[in-house]
Amino acid sequence: MKKFFFVLLALLGMTVIAAEKTVYDFNLNSIDGQSTPLSTFRGKVMLLVNVASRCGYTPQYSGLEALYEKYKDRGFVIVGIPANNFGAQEPGTNQEIKTFCTAKYHVTFPMMAKVSVKGSDITPLYAFLTDRSAHPSTGGEIGWNFTKFLVGPDGRVIGRFDSAVEPDSKQLTSAVEKALANLK
């Protein structure tokens, strides 16, 4: 009977682990309007960044593109997620955002359609990312544009970097390199 109890307990524990949410449980629309399951990027190291075209941090697009180019062949992807939550700094349509990013910053990493990253209309992905109970060390409300979430190949958040952390900073590049070193 004791053996049966431990087997049952182990199976229940495995069910709880299997049911744990990851970013792969969410879908976004691409900037072109196509449904994009984040599971498309399963097995890669992913950097999710809420972006804006009229922000003091907008020049980070150049650094993000350079970071993407440097590591994309090693299993790294950046996902740009436009949001208009801070000072109305992303007022354009998805087409205007796409044109701006490609013409001015030559962005080639995946860009998603504009969403809300805070407030009553927060998109489910950002509700998940900012949930302190799910992510005690990386959760909490988004403070500004260009907040970055580093996601491991298993879909779990492994780091968060605020707007002031430049894409070419040692802090961010070291975290990306460490995550890439752990790819199977």
For each predicted feature, which ranges?
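Amphipathic alpha-helical repeat scaffolds
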Residues: 30, 50-54
